[in-house]
Curated annotation (Swiss-Prot):
A cellular-component GO term for this protein: cytosol
GO biological process per UniProt: glycine biosynthetic process from serine; tetrahydrofolate interconversion
EC number(s) from the headed UniProt entry: 2.1.2.1
Site-annotated residues for Plays an important role in substrate specificity: 225
Source organism of the structure: Listeria monocytogenes serotype 4a (strain HCC23)
Assembly and oligomerization: Homodimer.
Designated name of the protein: Serine hydroxymethyltransferase
Sequence positions that bind (6S)-5,6,7,8-tetrahydrofolate: 117, 121-123, 349-351
Family named by the database record: Belongs to the SHMT family.
Localisation: Cytoplasm
PTM annotation (N6-(pyridoxal phosphate)lysine): residues: 226
UniProt key word Transcription regulation: no
Length: 413
């Protein structure tokens, strides 16, 4: 960042501070990851200068022959990665990917069945404060109160009762595997479209460690970061028959020019995900997640559903008499970054919450194995049991520093 340091020291200094934070902290926010240097290099390339409204071979601007190569690479790699007939890599985010799918087959006021936000769904799955809940008539399904897991019989009952035009599967805070084949059966029974939002688990799906929704869903959306370990962005996968309508929904429907530098970074990340090393990485994610859940429970910290099948888990703080807001703040002060999160049948506000969500994708990228993640689980437990004990917190902070120093991040930057 030689030029930035010279021309705009204020921005440069802020970036350096953030790099320092990422290096010094144990990053456990489930939606975050650390991209490779080559992904960042593609994002910072001259492609940021190019406008390219339209699609490869059908642009509304001249001079697109080279960005066409990049977008074709991204699309082809995405299709190979997930076994899809069609891929659109232009969505700027997962939310816009979801919006485009809704825009393609729904009319305002249509009924859609989606997962309750506090039970693990997402804002774009029908929250009343989101465009999805404003434009469409979303009805909810959730998890069982006893197991905190999806009960497909209850989903089926809701579908039969409400006769939705679309069913949305997928979650942002659900630690167990989702049976997309079962969702397909339910959708077929009521004549509904099935959209799967696999944003959080896309990397695990690509690695063959979670059921692939693409063969079952009419539409599959995802972000390209999180477990997929690419740049911040979105993507849509579908059957080839939807190509024309979905393309029009993205452009000119809800977006203008695509971000070609981000699409280049997506192509690089997809290329990385096609390598055997990525599968090994995702296998380590699963091992780390299970070990973290096991360690927390062994130290009297409640983990919802008793464990995890993916990269994240939810901690129920009610038995400890804590709120997510308080726990997040103190954990951050000792160098452990998590996010407060609602839990099923929540009694606190979304800004306070009764839980925290933790994910291991980023620390696994950093090189943490089961031995390291067990140490993390012990550190979290000590903080949660000693939220106001300054001596304990100071000791934890020192041990966090020792641990992060053992796993250097971006040493070349």
């Amino acid at each position: 960042m030689v030029y930035l340091q010279k021309q705009d020291k204020e921005v440069f200094d802020a970036i350096k501070l953030e790099l320092g934070r990422q290096r010094a902290n144990i990053e456990l926010i489930a939606s975050e990851n650390f991209v490779s240097e080559q992904v960042m290099e593609a994002m910072g390339s001259v492609l940021t200068n190019k406008y390219a409204e339209g699609y490869p071979g059908k642009r509304y601007y001249g001079g697109c022959e080279f960005v066409d190569i990049v977008e074709d690479l991204a699309r082809d790699r995405a299709k190979k990665l997930f076994g899809a007939e069609y891929a659109n890599v232009q969505p700027h985010s997962g939310a816009q990917a979801n919006m485009a799918v809704y825009h393609t087959v729904l009319e305002p006021g249509d009924t859609v069945l989606g997962m309750n936000l506090s039970h693990g769904g997402h804002l774009t799955h029908g929250s009343p404060v989101n465009f999805s809940g404003v434009l469409y008539n979303f009805v909810e399904y959730g998890v069982r109160e006893d197991t905190k897991e999806i009960d497909y019989d209850i989903v089926r009952e809701a579908a039969l009762k409400h006769k939705p035009k679309m069913i949305v599967a997928g979650a942002s805070a659900y630690p167990r595997k989702i049976d997309f084949a079962k969702f397909r059966e339910i959708a077929d029974e009521v004549g509904a479209y099935l959209m799967v939002d696999m944003a959080h688990i896309a990397g695990l799906v690509a690695a063959g460690l979670h059921q692939n929704p693409v063969p079952y869903a009419d539409f599959t959306t995802t972000t390209t970061h999180k477990t997929l370990r690419g740049p911040r962005g979105g993507m849509i996968l579908a059957k080839a028959e939807w190509e024309q309508k979905l393309n029009k929904s993205i452009f000119p429907g809800i977006q203008g020019g695509p971000l070609m530098h981000v699409i280049a970074a997506k192509a690089v990340a997809f290329g990385e995900a096609l390598q055997p090393e990525f599968t090994a990485y995702c296998e380590q994610i699963i091992r780390n997640s299970k070990k973290l859940a096991e360690t927390l429970q062994a130290n009297d910290v409640a983990v919802l559903t008793g464990g995890s099948d993916n990269h994240l888990l939810l901690i129920d703080l009610k038995p400890l008499g804590l709120t997510g807001k308080a726990a997040e703040k103190v954990l951050d002060e000792v160098g452990i970054t998590v996010n407060k999160n609602t839990i099923p049948f929540e009694t606190e506000s979304p800004f306070v919450t009764s839980g925290i969500r933790v994910g291991v994708a980023a620390v696994t990228t950093r090189g943490f194995d089961e031995v390291a993640i067990e140490k993390v689980g012990v550190l979290i437990s000590e903080v949660l049991h000693n939220l106001e004990n300054e001596e304990v917190l100071a000791d934890v902070k020192a041990r966090v520093a020792t641990l992060t120093n053992e796993y250097p991040l971006y040493p070349s930057l």
